[in-house]
Amino acid sequence: MEPTSKKLTGRLMLAVGGAVLGSLQFGYNTGVINAPQKVIEEFYNQTWVQRYGEPIPPATLTTLWSLSVAIFSVGGMIGSFSVGLFVNRFGRRNSMLMMNLLAFVSAVLMGFSKLGKSFEMLILGRFIIGVYCGLTTGFVPMYVGEVSPTELRGALGTLHQLGIVVGILIAQVFGLDSIMGNQELWPLLLSVIFIPALLQCILLPFCPESPRFLLINRNEENRAKSVLKKLRGTADVTRDLQEMKEESRQMMREKKVTILELFRSAAYRQPILIAVVLQLSQQLSGINAVFYYSTSIFEKAGVQQPVYATIGSGIVNTAFTVVSLFVVERAGRRTLHLIGLAGMAGCAVLMTIALALLERLPWMSYLSIVAIFGFVAFFEVGPGPIPWFIVAELFSQGPRPAAIAVAGFSNWTSNFIVGMCFQYVEQLCGPYVFIIFTVLLVLFFIFTYFKVPETKGRTFDEIASGFRQGGASQSDKTPEELFHPLGADSQV
């Protein structure tokens, strides 16, 4: 291994930083709708009165608000499933650049919805930015994974999740009543997304196209070699080129991989199952339930200023993503995911106990806060960042876009289900709702322990070869048995 292969060059930092602005958009638009709920509902009511001369019926208001929140995930499902249509035709970088048009259109619709006295404009804007974010959750991990050297792929892949949590935190802070979450400024709160979109439009033209896309998809070896030299900061990129050429030869031996082929072929069935289950482990862990309803959970816990406690959880969220960034290449993906799932299960039990005993023991409110902060911290150790970039690692260049589309669709669909159902399940189960998530977390832990391989320090082709060699006959082996022959020690 050349000593320069671990080098974090300026061009590599620019490429990853430019891409991760899309992740920040995703996080911001996930969190921005919660804080100004009451003032936006008042806008809906005023608009209804102006149109029909009477206050909006409560059931209609609830439906419109639920639609405003949920339509974002519907857009995300459509966007995530469309990833392959763009990245193979236009390239990774150009696809990210083009999609900013959606962000600009959405910003205009939401920003002028109050002036236009139209809640339909706001809902349509939420749908369009949802499509943008769905595409982003495919484009960014794919691009970052393909421009990063093997030894830095996990750490740089974690930056996608860091962008998301920073976006959520910014949305929580901007959404404070004293800043933009008020009657006058909420349209600006929703439309400020044009700023990162504009910044990304400025930066991306200076970022290189994915060298893997150039060599394997376009057969432009000279361009790929030139890009690699800039990304790696060295003239000797022989190892990277050889690895890509081997992957290209393997891809030529395979027929074109469609989404259906991922499930039909024995070589892809296990990795696509792993990819989907890891995405489900992120969304069905209960983290979105905590974020969607954190303010009301803190209120039930007796916290005097719940909105600031929610921001506190956002800070914890960000801090532990940074921790994951520094340890993912040392501890490995699988280990961190297992630690995160186990820790979240323990915190979910604590949260259940605290909420159940709150009326009899007021000091349990403090335990609930500790449990929520712990839950968020363990999420960012593993289940937060790892499912995003490990999908790109599990597949070679050919099936990667289709696999990322399926995984992203699974993520957004489960996100939508949790967002729509949690409130009703919480009303039914009361403080015991997090027991459901505890059971799911334990099941995901068992699956990860027995089925998920360690990808740390391995090239894309080595990981894919492990599945090809193993096939269906290897599916019952432990991750250590499955990947032991690959000689990963030489890569670390």
Swiss-Prot record:
The modification N-acetylmethionine is found at residue 1. Its main location: membrane. One of its GO terms (molecular function) is D-glucose transmembrane transporter activity. SUPFAM superfamilies: MFS general substrate transporter. It is found in: Cell membrane; Photoreceptor inner segment. Phosphorylation at Ser-226 by PKC promotes glucose uptake by increasing cell membrane localization. It is a multi-pass membrane protein. Glycans are attached at residue 45. Residues 34-66, 113-120, 177-185, 294-306, 356-365, 423-429 are extracellular. Residues 1-11, 88-90, 145-155, 207-271, 329-334, 389-401, 451-492 are cytoplasmic. CDD domains: MFS_GLUT_Class1 (cd17431). The uptake of glucose is inhibited by cytochalasin B. Glucose uptake is increased in response to phorbol ester 12-O-tetradecanoylphorbol-13-acetate (TPA) treatment: TPA-induced glucose uptake requires phosphorylation at Ser-226. NCBIfam families: SP. Facilitative glucose transporter, which is responsible for constitutive or basal glucose uptake. Has a very broad substrate specificity; can transport a wide range of aldoses including both pentoses and hexoses. Most important energy carrier of the brain: present at the blood-brain barrier and assures the energy-independent, facilitative transport of glucose into the brain. In association with BSG and NXNL1, promotes retinal cone survival by increasing glucose uptake into photoreceptors. Required for mesendoderm differentiation. This is Solute carrier family 2, facilitated glucose transporter member 1. The lineage of its organism: Eukaryota, Metazoa, Chordata, Craniata, Vertebrata. The gene is SLC2A1.
